[in-house]
């Protein structure tokens, strides 16, 4: 099966970038999810495999607890905890690999550090409208995940034969999480061929699934139940749903990062629903609301994310951020739903 993504000129550029690099930084977006973390660590494992030993994986902030088992996770450097170390890594880098984000602003507080680096930049991503001021841009929004792209690149670089179980596990985790356990954006035959190739590397797919999706605390499950029971609003005639979550509610249930992961997908189980919106107060920044959108059944939420929520992402899975109160954010969400009422009806 044909997996190659790069033409001859591009693969030559990639080989040169890697062969000439000694100090490599790998970075991903703020609030790194399974795909961001999995692709970054998988790329690190591959680079180790080809003899690159001075690699720094730098994240803007914390990964969810359910990803801490990923092989190599203990090497991740958080900018919000160790800023000087991250700044030093970028300053000394002779190659910066940007994984799973399309715009510099997606690294949040780490943006200035990223942009101050004079090293050539390699972008590997599957989001729409990527920045292109890179030595090489590998952007494929049609792919299921950045992890899928990483697998394809490793294969094209003749790295599959020596791929470790650790690397394969990271790739599988990212592909799995970015497709909701292969329930959406995962209908191409190539995806299941790749899964077969990863299984041949002795990954334990059931264990990976359980570590990610069956890893909630009692408090997390009660928080999720509270939101669905008491906070979820459904506009039946417009096939839309939204909910708000305040800092106080999160504190009541002892919220930790990852407790609400994937919750925005749950309302999509309602028959005929086309749009689900999550509005959550940022626990660290005042008057900041984090927005997640999911869509299905022929409606695409990405334009709404860009128009109303200062965001973007994928056609059916997008995010954004509002600098306002949670009450104001709710009114913006209602306005957005009404704006697209003809498409939602």
Regions found by a protein language model. Give the residues of each.
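Hydrophobic helix-and-loop "lid/oligomerization" segment in the mid-to-C-terminal part
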Residues: 2-30, 38-71, 78, 84-87, ...
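Generic enzyme active-site microenvironment
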Residues: 27, 31, 98, 123-124, ...
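Short glycine-rich anion-binding loops that position phosphate/pyrophosphate groups of nucleotides
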Residues: 31-32, 101-104, 127-129, 247-248, ...
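Short glycine/serine/threonine-rich phosphate/pyrophosphate-binding segments
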Residues: 34-40, 104-108
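Glycine-rich, phosphate-binding/catalytic loops in enzymes
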Residues: 43-44, 113-116, 139-140, 193
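Short, hinge-like loop/turn segments at secondary-structure boundaries
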Residues: 72-76, 116, 139-142, 295
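Active-site cofactor/cluster-binding pocket
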Residues: 77-136
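Short alpha-helices
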Residues: 124-194
């Amino acid at each position: 099966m044909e997996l190659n993504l790069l033409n001859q000129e591009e693969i030559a550029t990639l080989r040169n970038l890697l062969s000439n690099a000694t100090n490599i930084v790998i970075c991903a977006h703020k609030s790194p999810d399974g795909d961001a973390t999995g692709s970054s660590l998988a790329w690190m494992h591959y680079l180790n495999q080809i003899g690159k030993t001075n690699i720094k994986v730098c994240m803007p902030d914390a990964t969810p607890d359910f990803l801490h088992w990923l092989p190599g996770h203990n090497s991740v450097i958080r900018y919000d905890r160790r800023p000087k170390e991250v700044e030093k890594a970028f300053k000394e880098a002779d190659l910066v690999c940007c994984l799973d984000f399309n715009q510099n602003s997606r690294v949040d507080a780490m943006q200035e550090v990223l942009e101050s680096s004079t090293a050539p930049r390699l972008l590997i991503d599957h989001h729409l409208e990527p920045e292109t001021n890179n030595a090489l841009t590998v952007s494929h929004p049609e792919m299921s995940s950045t992890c899928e792209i990483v697998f394809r690149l490793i294969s094209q670089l003749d790295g599959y034969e020596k791929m470790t179980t650790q690397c394969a596990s990271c790739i599988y985790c990212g592909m799995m999480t970015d497709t909701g356990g292969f329930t959406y954006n995962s209908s191409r035959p190539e995806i299941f061929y790749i899964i077969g190739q990863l299984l041949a590397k002795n990954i334990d797919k059931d264990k990976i699934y359980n570590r990610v999706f069956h890893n909630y605390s009692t408090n997390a499950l009660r928080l999720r139940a509270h939101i669905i029971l008491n906070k979820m609003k459904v506009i039946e005639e417009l096939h839309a749903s939204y909910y708000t979550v305040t800092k106080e509610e999160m504190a009541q249930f002892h919220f930790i990062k990852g407790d609400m992961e994937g919750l925005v997908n749950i309302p999509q189980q309602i028959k005929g629903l086309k749009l689900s919106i999550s509005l959550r107060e940022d626990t660290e920044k005042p008057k900041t609301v984090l927005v997640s959108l999911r869509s299905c059944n022929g409606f695409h939420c990405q334009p709404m994310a860009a128009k109303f929520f200062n965001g973007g992402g994928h056609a059916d899975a997008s995010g954004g951020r509002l600098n306002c109160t949670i009450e104001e954010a709710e009114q913006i969400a209602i306005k957005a739903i009404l704006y697209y009422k003809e498409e939602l009806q």
